[in-house]
Protein backbone atom coordinates (compact mmCIF):
# COMPACT_ATOMS: atom_id res chain seq x y z
CA UNK A 1 0.00 0.00 0.00
CA UNK A 2 1.16 3.50 -0.70
CA UNK A 3 1.33 5.80 2.29
CA UNK A 4 1.65 9.50 3.08
CA UNK A 5 -0.43 12.58 2.58
CA UNK A 6 0.91 13.14 -0.93
CA UNK A 7 2.08 10.44 -3.28
CA UNK A 8 4.48 10.96 -6.15
CA UNK A 9 5.31 8.10 -8.47
CA UNK A 10 8.18 7.72 -10.88
CA UNK A 11 7.26 8.10 -14.52
CA UNK A 12 7.73 4.92 -16.49
CA UNK A 13 9.76 5.82 -19.52
CA UNK A 14 7.80 5.77 -22.77
CA UNK A 15 9.62 7.68 -25.51
CA UNK A 16 6.81 7.00 -27.95
CA UNK A 17 3.19 6.14 -27.37
CA UNK A 18 2.32 2.80 -28.96
CA UNK A 19 -1.23 1.59 -29.38
CA UNK A 20 -1.04 -2.21 -29.40
CA UNK A 21 -4.17 -3.95 -30.55
CA UNK A 22 -4.33 -7.65 -31.31
CA UNK A 23 -0.85 -7.84 -32.79
CA UNK A 24 -1.03 -4.48 -34.55
CA UNK A 25 0.88 -1.41 -33.41
CA UNK A 26 0.06 2.21 -34.14
CA UNK A 27 2.70 4.80 -33.33
CA UNK A 28 2.19 8.49 -32.80
CA UNK A 29 4.27 11.51 -31.92
CA UNK A 30 2.03 12.07 -28.89
CA UNK A 31 3.88 11.65 -25.61
CA UNK A 32 1.87 11.57 -22.39
CA UNK A 33 2.78 13.97 -19.58
CA UNK A 34 4.53 12.91 -16.36
CA UNK A 35 2.48 10.95 -13.88
CA UNK A 36 -0.06 12.87 -11.84
CA UNK A 37 0.62 13.74 -8.21
CA UNK A 38 -2.40 13.00 -6.04
CA UNK A 39 -3.12 14.27 -2.54
CA UNK A 40 -4.14 11.64 -0.04
CA UNK A 41 -3.46 7.96 0.48
CA UNK A 42 -4.47 5.41 -2.16
CA UNK A 43 -6.33 2.38 -0.86
CA UNK A 44 -5.20 0.07 -3.65
CA UNK A 45 -1.84 -0.88 -5.11
CA UNK A 46 -1.04 0.48 -8.56
CA UNK A 47 -1.59 -1.61 -11.70
CA UNK A 48 1.64 -2.08 -13.65
CA UNK A 49 1.05 -1.69 -17.38
CA UNK A 50 4.64 -0.72 -18.21
CA UNK A 51 5.62 -4.32 -18.95
CA UNK A 52 2.61 -4.85 -21.23
CA UNK A 53 1.41 -7.43 -18.73
CA UNK A 54 -1.77 -9.29 -19.57
CA UNK A 55 -3.34 -11.72 -17.14
CA UNK A 56 -4.41 -15.27 -17.95
CA UNK A 57 -8.00 -14.19 -17.29
CA UNK A 58 -7.74 -11.43 -19.91
CA UNK A 59 -6.08 -13.72 -22.45
CA UNK A 60 -8.89 -16.24 -22.10
CA UNK A 61 -11.57 -13.54 -22.20
CA UNK A 62 -10.12 -11.78 -25.23
CA UNK A 63 -9.59 -14.99 -27.22
CA UNK A 64 -13.04 -16.44 -26.59
CA UNK A 65 -15.21 -16.11 -29.71
CA UNK A 66 -18.31 -16.54 -27.55
CA UNK A 67 -17.40 -13.67 -25.22
CA UNK A 68 -19.73 -10.66 -25.18
CA UNK A 69 -18.56 -7.09 -24.51
CA UNK A 70 -21.17 -4.40 -23.88
CA UNK A 71 -20.39 -0.68 -24.34
CA UNK A 72 -22.76 2.11 -23.28
CA UNK A 73 -22.48 5.54 -24.89
CA UNK A 74 -21.07 3.92 -28.03
CA UNK A 75 -22.26 6.50 -30.55
CA UNK A 76 -19.11 8.65 -30.54
CA UNK A 77 -15.85 9.64 -28.85
CA UNK A 78 -14.56 7.16 -26.26
CA UNK A 79 -17.55 4.85 -26.42
CA UNK A 80 -17.11 4.42 -30.16
CA UNK A 81 -13.36 3.97 -29.73
CA UNK A 82 -13.97 1.19 -27.21
CA UNK A 83 -16.09 -0.58 -29.84
CA UNK A 84 -13.33 -0.21 -32.43
CA UNK A 85 -10.53 -1.38 -30.18
CA UNK A 86 -12.50 -4.26 -28.68
CA UNK A 87 -13.04 -5.48 -32.23
CA UNK A 88 -9.29 -5.71 -32.77
CA UNK A 89 -8.22 -6.68 -29.26
CA UNK A 90 -10.80 -9.42 -28.72
CA UNK A 91 -12.40 -12.18 -30.78
CA UNK A 92 -15.81 -11.93 -29.19
CA UNK A 93 -19.03 -10.10 -29.90
CA UNK A 94 -19.56 -6.39 -29.25
CA UNK A 95 -22.88 -4.85 -28.20
CA UNK A 96 -22.90 -1.10 -28.88
CA UNK A 97 -25.57 0.69 -26.84
CA UNK A 98 -26.58 4.13 -28.08
CA UNK A 99 -29.48 6.48 -27.45
CA UNK A 100 -31.08 6.08 -30.88
CA UNK A 101 -29.75 3.54 -33.43
CA UNK A 102 -29.36 5.15 -36.84
CA UNK A 103 -28.75 8.60 -35.35
CA UNK A 104 -24.96 8.30 -35.05
CA UNK A 105 -23.10 9.12 -38.29
CA UNK A 106 -19.75 8.36 -36.62
CA UNK A 107 -20.83 4.87 -35.55
CA UNK A 108 -22.53 4.18 -38.88
CA UNK A 109 -19.38 5.20 -40.75
CA UNK A 110 -17.17 3.02 -38.55
CA UNK A 111 -19.43 0.02 -38.99
CA UNK A 112 -19.57 0.59 -42.74
CA UNK A 113 -15.80 0.27 -42.95
CA UNK A 114 -15.69 -3.13 -41.26
CA UNK A 115 -15.25 -6.44 -43.03
CA UNK A 116 -18.34 -8.60 -43.30
CA UNK A 117 -17.12 -10.91 -40.53
CA UNK A 118 -16.33 -8.06 -38.13
CA UNK A 119 -19.61 -6.29 -38.89
CA UNK A 120 -21.43 -9.49 -37.94
CA UNK A 121 -19.76 -9.31 -34.52
CA UNK A 122 -21.39 -5.96 -33.66
CA UNK A 123 -24.94 -5.61 -32.42
CA UNK A 124 -26.34 -2.08 -32.00
CA UNK A 125 -29.15 -1.65 -29.47
CA UNK A 126 -30.99 1.39 -28.06
CA UNK A 127 -30.31 2.48 -24.49
CA UNK A 128 -30.98 5.59 -22.46
CA UNK A 129 -29.07 4.89 -19.25
CA UNK A 130 -31.55 7.01 -17.29
CA UNK A 131 -34.45 4.76 -18.33
CA UNK A 132 -34.69 1.65 -16.15
CA UNK A 133 -37.20 -0.02 -18.47
CA UNK A 134 -34.75 0.25 -21.36
CA UNK A 135 -31.96 -1.19 -19.22
CA UNK A 136 -34.21 -4.14 -18.37
CA UNK A 137 -35.07 -4.58 -22.06
CA UNK A 138 -31.38 -4.66 -22.99
CA UNK A 139 -30.68 -7.22 -20.27
CA UNK A 140 -33.56 -9.38 -21.51
CA UNK A 141 -32.38 -9.23 -25.13
CA UNK A 142 -28.79 -10.01 -24.17
CA UNK A 143 -29.97 -12.97 -22.12
CA UNK A 144 -32.08 -14.31 -24.99
CA UNK A 145 -29.36 -13.74 -27.61
CA UNK A 146 -26.13 -14.57 -25.77
CA UNK A 147 -27.00 -15.71 -22.23
CA UNK A 148 -23.76 -14.12 -21.00
CA UNK A 149 -21.77 -10.90 -20.71
CA UNK A 150 -18.00 -10.95 -20.24
CA UNK A 151 -17.28 -7.23 -20.13
CA UNK A 152 -19.51 -4.24 -19.39
CA UNK A 153 -18.03 -0.84 -20.22
CA UNK A 154 -20.08 1.96 -18.64
CA UNK A 155 -18.88 4.83 -20.82
CA UNK A 156 -22.00 7.01 -21.14
CA UNK A 157 -21.62 10.21 -19.15
CA UNK A 158 -22.41 13.92 -19.08
CA UNK A 159 -20.53 17.03 -17.97
CA UNK A 160 -22.15 19.96 -19.78
CA UNK A 161 -20.66 22.96 -21.55
CA UNK A 162 -22.07 25.86 -19.48
CA UNK A 163 -23.43 27.38 -22.69
CA UNK A 164 -26.37 25.14 -23.49
CA UNK A 165 -26.51 23.46 -20.06
CA UNK A 166 -26.71 24.60 -16.43
CA UNK A 167 -23.34 23.09 -15.64
CA UNK A 168 -20.60 22.63 -14.85
CA UNK A 169 -21.09 25.14 -12.07
CA UNK A 170 -18.42 27.64 -11.06
CA UNK A 171 -19.97 28.53 -7.69
CA UNK A 172 -22.80 27.53 -5.35
CA UNK A 173 -25.16 30.16 -6.70
CA UNK A 174 -25.19 28.36 -10.06
CA UNK A 175 -26.43 25.05 -8.67
CA UNK A 176 -29.56 23.94 -10.49
CA UNK A 177 -31.60 21.11 -8.99
CA UNK A 178 -32.73 19.63 -12.30
CA UNK A 179 -29.18 19.62 -13.67
CA UNK A 180 -27.79 18.13 -10.46
CA UNK A 181 -30.34 15.33 -10.63
CA UNK A 182 -29.60 14.76 -14.32
CA UNK A 183 -25.87 14.44 -13.59
CA UNK A 184 -26.56 11.82 -10.95
CA UNK A 185 -29.01 10.00 -13.24
CA UNK A 186 -26.47 9.68 -16.06
CA UNK A 187 -23.14 9.48 -14.24
CA UNK A 188 -24.02 7.42 -11.16
CA UNK A 189 -27.48 5.85 -11.31
CA UNK A 190 -27.16 4.79 -14.96
CA UNK A 191 -23.92 2.79 -14.59
CA UNK A 192 -25.04 1.18 -11.34
CA UNK A 193 -28.44 0.18 -12.74
CA UNK A 194 -26.77 -1.22 -15.86
CA UNK A 195 -24.42 -3.22 -13.66
CA UNK A 196 -27.32 -4.38 -11.50
CA UNK A 197 -29.46 -5.62 -14.39
CA UNK A 198 -26.55 -7.28 -16.23
CA UNK A 199 -24.99 -8.83 -13.11
CA UNK A 200 -26.72 -12.21 -13.63
CA UNK A 201 -25.24 -12.40 -17.14
CA UNK A 202 -21.80 -11.42 -15.83
CA UNK A 203 -21.83 -14.25 -13.29
CA UNK A 204 -19.07 -16.78 -13.98
CA UNK A 205 -19.10 -18.87 -10.83
CA UNK A 206 -21.30 -20.07 -7.98
CA UNK A 207 -19.24 -20.59 -4.87
CA UNK A 208 -16.10 -22.32 -6.07
CA UNK A 209 -17.81 -23.85 -9.10
CA UNK A 210 -17.20 -22.15 -12.45
CA UNK A 211 -20.26 -21.94 -14.68
CA UNK A 212 -18.66 -21.58 -18.11
CA UNK A 213 -16.76 -24.14 -20.13
CA UNK A 214 -15.08 -21.56 -22.35
CA UNK A 215 -13.43 -18.21 -21.82
CA UNK A 216 -12.06 -16.64 -18.68
CA UNK A 217 -13.21 -17.46 -15.20
CA UNK A 218 -13.70 -13.74 -14.47
CA UNK A 219 -15.85 -11.07 -16.11
CA UNK A 220 -15.24 -7.33 -15.78
CA UNK A 221 -17.22 -4.12 -15.27
CA UNK A 222 -15.37 -0.96 -16.31
CA UNK A 223 -16.67 2.44 -15.21
CA UNK A 224 -15.37 5.81 -16.38
CA UNK A 225 -14.84 8.18 -13.48
CA UNK A 226 -12.90 11.43 -13.03
CA UNK A 227 -10.05 12.76 -10.95
CA UNK A 228 -12.28 15.54 -9.65
CA UNK A 229 -14.38 12.85 -7.95
CA UNK A 230 -11.60 12.23 -5.43
CA UNK A 231 -12.38 13.81 -2.06
CA UNK A 232 -8.79 13.41 -0.83
CA UNK A 233 -7.42 15.11 -3.92
CA UNK A 234 -9.89 18.00 -3.78
CA UNK A 235 -7.63 20.73 -2.41
CA UNK A 236 -9.03 23.57 -4.50
CA UNK A 237 -9.82 24.53 -8.06
CA UNK A 238 -13.06 24.77 -9.98
CA UNK A 239 -16.33 23.92 -8.26
CA UNK A 240 -18.06 21.62 -10.79
CA UNK A 241 -20.35 20.51 -7.97
CA UNK A 242 -22.77 18.23 -9.80
CA UNK A 243 -20.09 16.47 -11.85
CA UNK A 244 -17.78 15.91 -8.86
CA UNK A 245 -20.63 14.66 -6.69
CA UNK A 246 -22.07 12.29 -9.30
CA UNK A 247 -18.71 10.72 -10.11
CA UNK A 248 -17.86 10.39 -6.40
CA UNK A 249 -21.17 8.56 -5.98
CA UNK A 250 -20.20 6.26 -8.85
CA UNK A 251 -16.87 5.50 -7.16
CA UNK A 252 -18.68 4.50 -3.97
CA UNK A 253 -21.01 2.31 -6.00
CA UNK A 254 -18.06 0.59 -7.66
CA UNK A 255 -16.31 0.04 -4.33
CA UNK A 256 -19.43 -1.25 -2.58
CA UNK A 257 -20.53 -3.54 -5.42
CA UNK A 258 -17.05 -5.03 -5.80
CA UNK A 259 -17.48 -7.11 -2.64
CA UNK A 260 -20.69 -8.69 -3.92
CA UNK A 261 -19.58 -9.07 -7.53
CA UNK A 262 -16.28 -10.67 -6.52
CA UNK A 263 -18.20 -13.66 -5.16
CA UNK A 264 -19.72 -14.34 -8.57
CA UNK A 265 -16.43 -14.02 -10.46
CA UNK A 266 -16.87 -10.41 -11.62
CA UNK A 267 -14.26 -7.70 -11.12
CA UNK A 268 -15.25 -4.03 -11.25
CA UNK A 269 -13.10 -0.93 -11.55
CA UNK A 270 -13.36 2.87 -11.87
CA UNK A 271 -10.97 4.52 -14.33
CA UNK A 272 -9.97 8.15 -14.83
CA UNK A 273 -9.12 8.57 -18.53
CA UNK A 274 -7.35 11.92 -18.24
CA UNK A 275 -8.20 14.95 -20.37
CA UNK A 276 -9.09 13.27 -23.65
CA UNK A 277 -9.98 14.94 -26.93
CA UNK A 278 -13.72 14.25 -26.90
CA UNK A 279 -16.85 16.28 -27.48
CA UNK A 280 -17.29 16.44 -23.70
CA UNK A 281 -13.87 18.00 -23.06
CA UNK A 282 -13.67 20.37 -26.04
CA UNK A 283 -15.26 23.37 -24.25
CA UNK A 284 -12.55 23.14 -21.59
CA UNK A 285 -9.47 22.53 -23.72
CA UNK A 286 -6.93 25.33 -24.14
CA UNK A 287 -4.07 25.85 -26.56
CA UNK A 288 -1.60 25.60 -23.69
CA UNK A 289 -3.02 22.23 -22.65
CA UNK A 290 -2.70 20.92 -26.19
CA UNK A 291 0.86 22.20 -26.58
CA UNK A 292 1.94 20.53 -23.32
CA UNK A 293 0.42 17.20 -24.29
CA UNK A 294 -2.27 17.41 -21.63
CA UNK A 295 -5.05 16.54 -24.09
CA UNK A 296 -4.88 12.87 -25.03
CA UNK A 297 -5.90 11.45 -28.42
CA UNK A 298 -8.94 9.25 -27.87
CA UNK A 299 -7.12 6.28 -29.42
CA UNK A 300 -4.33 6.60 -26.84
CA UNK A 301 -6.71 6.87 -23.90
CA UNK A 302 -8.83 3.86 -24.79
CA UNK A 303 -5.77 1.76 -25.53
CA UNK A 304 -4.34 2.62 -22.11
CA UNK A 305 -7.61 1.88 -20.33
CA UNK A 306 -7.86 -1.50 -22.03
CA UNK A 307 -4.26 -2.20 -21.03
CA UNK A 308 -5.30 -1.62 -17.42
CA UNK A 309 -8.31 -3.91 -17.77
CA UNK A 310 -6.10 -6.62 -19.27
CA UNK A 311 -3.58 -6.24 -16.43
CA UNK A 312 -5.96 -6.03 -13.47
CA UNK A 313 -6.05 -8.79 -10.86
CA UNK A 314 -8.66 -9.68 -8.28
CA UNK A 315 -6.85 -7.50 -5.73
CA UNK A 316 -7.64 -4.47 -7.90
CA UNK A 317 -11.40 -4.96 -8.00
CA UNK A 318 -13.29 -2.01 -6.51
CA UNK A 319 -10.36 0.33 -7.09
CA UNK A 320 -10.05 3.79 -8.65
CA UNK A 321 -7.18 4.16 -11.11
CA UNK A 322 -5.95 6.65 -13.68
CA UNK A 323 -4.94 6.16 -17.31
CA UNK A 324 -1.44 5.08 -16.29
CA UNK A 325 -2.49 2.50 -13.72
CA UNK A 326 -1.91 4.74 -10.69
CA UNK A 327 -4.24 4.17 -7.77
CA UNK A 328 -6.16 7.37 -7.02
CA UNK A 329 -7.12 8.18 -3.42
CA UNK A 330 -10.87 8.14 -2.94
Stretches with model-predicted labels:
Residues 87-107:
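Conserved glycine-rich Rossmann-like NAD(P)H-binding loop of the short-chain dehydrogenase/reductase
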Residues 128-148:
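Conserved Rossmann-fold cofactor-binding substructure of NAD(P)-dependent oxidoreductases
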Residues 162, 230-234, 272-285:
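Short beta-loop-alpha junction of Rossmann-like oxidoreductase domains
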